[in-house]
Amino acid sequence: MSLVTSVNGNALILGLKGRLDQDSCDAFRDDLPPHLDAAARDHLAIVLDLSQLEYVSSAGLRCFMLAVKQAKTYNGRIVVAALQPMVAEIFQISRFDMLLEVFTTVAKAVAAVASSPSGEKT
């Protein structure tokens, strides 16, 4: 799993590539805090671009939940976007699509967080 970053408007986009499983989850968790710091400092929401994530295991799902929990300690917001069909199916079966904000495209996610990066109602 590798991580590619960019900024678009009020969104820090983190693109995950490859697989998020037991072997890569620790690296993802270790890589996340500096991005959470930057997002909090710059008042950005984090959009996880999953368009190039091929697979997510139960350990990877746990990683997503921990990321959301960490973001809340920063008063931040994490949303996911552009899920591949297999990853989308895993999200649906595990009901993660009910727990996390899921967008069909990165552009839609960026538009959704544009007015409220931390998720508060305006």
Please describe what each predicted stretch is.
Residues M1-G15:
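Short beta-strand/loop segment at the start of cytosolic alpha/beta domains
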Residues N10, P85, A107:
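Residues that form or immediately flank small-molecule/cofactor binding pockets and catalytic motifs
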Residues S6, A81, F103:
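General small-molecule cofactor/ligand-binding pocket signal
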Residues S2-L3, A45, M86, A114:
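Short leucine-rich amphipathic alpha-helices used at interfaces
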Residues Q22-L100:
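Amphipathic alpha-helical interaction surfaces in cytosolic regulatory modules
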Residues E101-T122:
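A charged, well-structured terminal subsegment
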Residues L12, A40-R41, K72, V110, ...:
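Intrinsic disorder/low-complexity segments
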